[in-house]
Amino acid sequence: MMDTKKKPLWILLASALAVGMAGCSGDDGKDGADGAPGTPGEDGQPGTSGLHIDMAEEAVAQISGASYAGGTITLEFDLANRQGVGLFGLSGENPDHDFRFSLAQLQQEEGSELKQWFSLLNETTNEAGTTFEQGFEKLKDCPECLTDHGDGTYTYTFKTDLSGYEDAAGVVFDEALTQRIAIEMQFEYASGHELAENAHYDWIPATNAQQGIGTRDLVTLETCYTCHQSDSLKAHGGRRLDMENCQSCHNGVVSDPNGVSVELGHMIHAIHMGPSRVGLDDTGTEVPMPYTVEGYHGPHAFDYPAFPTKPFMDCTVCHVADENLADGELWMANANGNACTGCHTDRPVQHGSFTVPEGMSCTDCHGSVDHTQSRAPYEAAKGYSVEVFNVMVTPENLLTFDVEVLDDQGNAVTEEEIYQQGYSNPYMVVSWDVEKDYPAQEVLSDDGTTTIGTTYDHRRFSLKGDGSSVYDNGVFHVTTSKVKSGKTYVMDLPADIAIRTLEILPVLKVCFEPHSAVRTDCTSEGAYPAYVQTPGYRTILGDTDATVAQRRAIVDDGKCFGCHSMEFYHDSNGVNCIACHTNDKTLKSDSASGGLKSTSFMYKAHKAQGHDNGHGGSGTLLKTDCTTCHSATEGWGGMDYGFALGRNAGQAHALPAKIGDPDAATWYASSDTAACMSCHQKYLSDAAMAHIRGNGGYFGAVKADAKAAQEACATCHSPQKVMGHHGHEL
């Protein structure tokens, strides 16, 4: 029988291969000729170099050049991180990439020599089409306008054809005038990370060059930083950072929908007037007129800013002389009436019933006014001195001393030329233990008619009016006992005062003619008082040759004067507030919380209006940055910081036991604990307070226990870590 079983496939293939090989001679013939070369392929895309912009911690923008041809502007710019590494990947198709371009030109106002920036690409802001704001070319509206060169350099071509462009506000592009291109970027990622940057480029399109450009540089942003900080000046959600970008947008053509000018000069003057901005209404009645503009959520009134500088009308606070400012003196040489109305409103109180005729400006009548002279009395007072001599302790344990006020020529100032009105008394404040934060506020006895103690009421004596002083031929003879509101206050002088540091601090004003350095009687019409800036008298009575110990460095006085200028809120002679506002000074009512608050210098510095406008910071100061006010000096082992903890053991700081309670008891905190509580008391949890107490801090009703506390805060909370906790670095 025939076997019909199928053989495996591999056996069949092997058999076929064997037959094929048997038919080969072993020679495969000559190699064929080489084929013709193939057609070269297209070049590949260049690779990127640098860092993708979405991976960057920060971005620095710089416009490297611009050109104009046929009505179109082409812009070259770079993006890099702070190390100079190029940032590629900017794209109008990326929803996180909010990137904008604006244009403005510098031109003279019609009928005026005043040169002003006028924005282009303007948009209307009301239905009538009569008010305008600066418009932008947004990258997301024209992604194809951008070329990314892959290395952090970019080219952007404006889509607007300026040769036939009709601006909504009627501004006519002139290629022969100075133009400003500005960049605004603000990337806000879902992670919370943000990139924000500005850049600008001034040039003349007709020549495609920067030679011969016009300027309008009146102030520097660094001057603003004297009071403000960079983060507090980030406008419009952090998009606007540079002065040049502010100028481009807040220019001579823009206003809110109601026609209120938001031109930079007008706006800045008006905002800083705050609640002091007043004018006349239609009936001729003086009324508050805080600067009010229509915003995204309705009208916004700037009735809260507190301009801290004295004298108030000292223009040089902002218009600081700076050789790098091309137009630093323009504000005097060519005053802008729009800036005038920023302070004085369109209906100045000083005008009364007078109405400015059509076509006239402020400078037509007031062109010769020199506001720089408003500081003349203060400048003069800086040259005055207060001499203290014949300091003695009486058998009754009172201190007596003589005081003479001298001008810069050594001439005595008379009693009639020394100012006294309201809270302004010509005080001599007596203190001891200066290096230990001044005397504690204690009342030894009070029988209703006489009180003996060391409170600031017991330690300050007026040269006029409280019975402590006798004036004789230019010299005031002072005894440390006075009468106030019918009660006699006697200072309790320490028995060992001869070996303690003694300070007698003069806090007084001298009267001058208005806007003048000429001294005058304080009853004269328009007499202007200015504080004498003179060092306090310090000594050790038992050893007048000894070196008098100083209070540790805490605050940088220069920063205080930089913002406040010649005068603080009151009683101003240097940064000596603690002479009265000691750590344990009595509490007072607090309208903000409805309860009580501390009145110590530390608390006031941390929480004063303008220093603190809410938890976590303020609109003026970045309060979380301790270096805003505190000192930093070179020490043996590096920098010594004025906010370092652990330097002031033995003190008791008065605080309310509970925030918001008008009947709260006075409790006391140890020094480092008080520093934290001056800002954070309202927000301290039980766990946080337990942590403080667990590390030696004290907060309770017993003053002696606060003084005896042995705090260990500084062990962990170094200045570097304190700054880190608040989001900053040293």
Label the model's feature ranges.
Residues 50-68, 373-396:
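Low-complexity, acidic Ser/Thr/Pro/Gly-rich terminal tails and inter-domain linkers that flank the onset
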Residues 57, 68-320, 398-664:
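Extended surface/linker regions that mediate inter-domain or inter-protein docking
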Residues 2-11:
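Bacterial N-terminal signal peptides that target proteins for export
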Residues 310-346, 624, 628-659, 666-730:
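Extracellular low-complexity, Gly/Ser/Thr-rich intrinsically disordered linkers
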Residues 234-237, 256-259, 325-330, 350-355, ...:
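Short Cys/His-rich "knuckle" micro-motifs
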